[in-house]
Amino acid sequence: MTDDNQNETMPTPQPLPGQVFIRPGIDDRPDYEKTLTPEAKAALKRLAVQQRPRVPEASNERPEVQAARLAEGGSPLTAAAHLDAAVPNLESSFLDLRDPMTAPDGSRPNALQVNRLTAGFALGSLLFAAPIAALDVVLIPQRIDQLVGDGRVAGLALTMALGMVLSFFMNAWIAVGSDHTFGPLGRRTPWIISGALLSAASLAILSVCDLLQLVIVFWLLMQIGYAMIAMPLAAAFGERVPDKFRDRADSWHGMGLALGQLLGILVAVYRTMHPAESGWDGTTRSGIMLFAIWFIVAGIVTLLVLPREGSSTYMPRESVRKGSFFSQYRPPKHAPKFAVAFIARMLAVAATTLIAVYQWYLAAFDLDADGLSGYGLTGAGAVVALMAVAAFVGSLMAVLLLGPIARAFEDARVPAVISCMLFVIGAAAPCMMADKLFGVGLYALIAGFAYAIYDGTSQSLNLATLPDVRSVGRSLAAFSVANTLGSLLGVIAGALAITALAAYLPLFGVAIGFMLLAGVLTMLLK
């Protein structure tokens, strides 16, 4: 056999009769790109259904985002109790055949990225909660006392109230703004970076201001910067964590918030060993400057731990409507119980806020704390640190018992009202006990425990007041306004009580009144 014969192709045999089967409508289908004329193609295009890309849901209408925002105004450790009263979400992948490993933003993180998401949001909540707690409880009261002296209460009330009002409006604007941000860094990352820089710059300038008016101006700028961090971070938490791991992420997020608040207060107290002295060694100025740097470090660490956010340039765009900013704060219609739950929540928040805001003045001017010392702390700093640790321990104890307590009662109103009564007992301790220092420590322990129980057990009651499960995110956004109004009410009521009675201990009496009203209103829920 020659080489030419070897390379010669063998003839293909003819197919047997019936061996070749042409599938009707498949194999004999014409190529329309070749057979149709341009006029016919244009006519078909006009008749075809145009598939429009779905615009992502607004972050303020996502139930997970609002649950994260509510945790900041309540007891953060409640999320670690893993209660069955979960926030309903009709967009959850567990309700259809979608992959629960796919996040709401469409990404599918691997195991390492899931761990980074959990750790990143926990670290972010811890690191960003610390400076806010330090400033609210320790540093800003110190600085205002140094600047205005006897007018400290009015100055602090004005500063805090203006900050709360501005934060409310900025949260609405920034939520919409971040939803409509399109760039290679994503929708949330640019806001977090800008907010950290603005907060740091505002605090750095505030630390050298010697006029109350300037302190208020830069405090408000810092509030804008913090809103630029908090709202996008909460939105990212709601859309980047897959449903399968959301329960775990919620727990770590809540623990991060609680630890951050405790850490911030302790660091501020330890840093301001000589708050009234001039200079930068152990003074209020150095403490404020420390947390200015803290904001930058917190932003860097959070964004490095979190997986990089994907580009948002490809996302479908929708123009901002006029009602987009505050429409989510409208209360649901035909829900009479919603108003009752709203007012109860507002009063409970007011009861805790009015003592937290003025506790530095309470420790410094109404308690015999000059001789108190321990763990390197003296005077008012030791009292505030004691109250912070006691409140954290009380909340931690409540988390361990919250699950069994919630399951022991079929009617959630019972443990909620009992916790209100327990808070009243704790608030009465400083007024009734001869040892005031021990009394405020006991109050912090009992109040931390009672408020965590109330926050956890009332969650199912609050959700039951919502009329339509399809709009639960929007309804929770309206419900979250109770945190702002409650804090504002607490600040104003506390200032009026201190000014009228020229003492700080009556704050506990006002707190008792607010919590009693909250308990009565809670009994009206079903």
Predicted regions located by residue number:
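A late C-terminal transmembrane helix in Major Facilitator Superfamily
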Residues: V469-A500
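C-terminal ends and interior cores of transmembrane alpha-helices
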Residues: I193-D210, M421-D435
